[in-house]
Amino acid sequence: KASVGFKAGVKDYRLTYYTPDYETKDTDILAAFRVTPQPGVPAEEAGAAVAAESSTGTWTTVWTDGLTSLDRYKGRCYHIEAVVGEENQYICYVAYPLDLFEEGSVTNMFTSIVGNVFGFKALRALRLEDLRIPPAYSKTFQGPPHGIQVERDKLNKYGRPLLGCTIKPKLGLSAKNYGRAVYECLRGGLDFTKDDENVNSQPFMRWRDRFVFCAEAIYKAQAETGEIKGHYLNATAGTCEEMMKRVTFARELGAPIVMHDYLTGGFTANTTLAHYCRDNGLLLHIHRAMHAVIDRQKNHGMHFRVLAKALRMSGGDHIHAGTVVGKLEGEREMTLGFVDLLRDDFIEKDRRRGIFFTQDWVSMPGVIPVASGGIHVWHMPALTEIFGDDSVLQFGGGTIGHPWGNAPGAVANRVALEACVQARNEGRDLAREGNEIIREAAKWSPELA
């Protein structure tokens, strides 16, 4: 019989994976999980189970454990705190050694950290609240194709938020009518128009026709306004090869920016696309379709700030980030927390804003947050104040729903934005005087009135 110090059988995870005296290393990836254990399961066991199942552990002791150094490779639950105001919920902090992850692969990072552990029997619910990505790991990623400053230089637009608009109705228009709507919005004063996330290549409008008519609209609007314009051409497709074919065609048309649905399209496809965009001078707009499936529940899934960090590593120049005002859910402090994580280089830990770890991006380019979803001109003062200059304010129905049509809707948005930026620069309080500022501007602009 075998007796080489190996004992088969099931033992508590906490004996191996709960290490409250562990000192985290600068190279560790740190995770904050919100854990709801099943009744009767101690918090330490639940936290240790998460650390084990998302790193080296399995449900029983195996003899091949002796062939490697568990101490070097195992995840460790190093701290647990009860969630204030919630019964039987804990924040469990887990540290993962860097060697567990493939360099430059968001796909592998998520497969390890959240791949298997969420179906675990000992847990009633589990949510990944935040990740600390060490510079040693973030430096293995290209990050955004261009970033905020390069985008401003490409567009030659400074000192104000950018304006966008999603073309509506999002499905059903022919390519030519779609291009016409794009032209009217850009001609009226917007910087960008956008394909909706589910506009790919449907029977009523194939992608190539849409790309051609949109390119024509962009060039016509640029010639008439003297400003650089763009339309987010959605290149998301059923296969990566098809996606790259569409992006290549967009580049040949001279389009400045393309778009990708990064959660439905997948991180592997997104990172591939981001590398192509940097190599070929294309900006990359990211839509977060499907995010609420993952981040809506408060006690299970993954917080959007984690998806936002992952996107900054995988690559994208814009990403939708909720609005704080409008039709889609978003709490102000939390939203501002992940907006900073997208844009800034160094973000201090701040639990009030949901930031569990200090994050140092070591000069990785920033991502512009896009505010969209049920917003209109009366929200403009609040949006300008909350999001600041480095943002895209995206109005769909708020432009195209104008009683006079698309171009006047775009004019109204642009006038409102310029009025708010000027008022802010003159030192006025947008939060208090916002409505008054818009009313004053409306005296000079029948479209806004």
Curated annotation (Swiss-Prot):
Binds 1 Mg(2+) ion per subunit. Mg(2+) binds at K194, D196, E197. The record marks K327 as: Transition state stabilizer. Pfam families: RuBisCO_large (PF00016), RuBisCO_large_N (PF02788). One of its GO terms (cellular component) is chloroplast. One of its GO terms (molecular function) is magnesium ion binding. The modification N6-carboxylysine is found at K194. The modification N6,N6,N6-trimethyllysine is found at K7. The disulfide bond which can form in the large chain dimeric partners within the hexadecamer appears to be associated with oxidative stress and protein turnover. One of its GO terms (biological process) is reductive pentose-phosphate cycle. The active site is at K168 (proton acceptor), H287 (proton acceptor). NCBIfam families: PRK04208.1. Heterohexadecamer of 8 large chains and 8 small chains; disulfide-linked. The disulfide link is formed within the large subunit homodimers. This is Ribulose bisphosphate carboxylase large chain. It comes from Aspidistra elatior (Cast-iron plant). The lineage of its organism: Eukaryota, Viridiplantae, Streptophyta, Embryophyta, Tracheophyta.
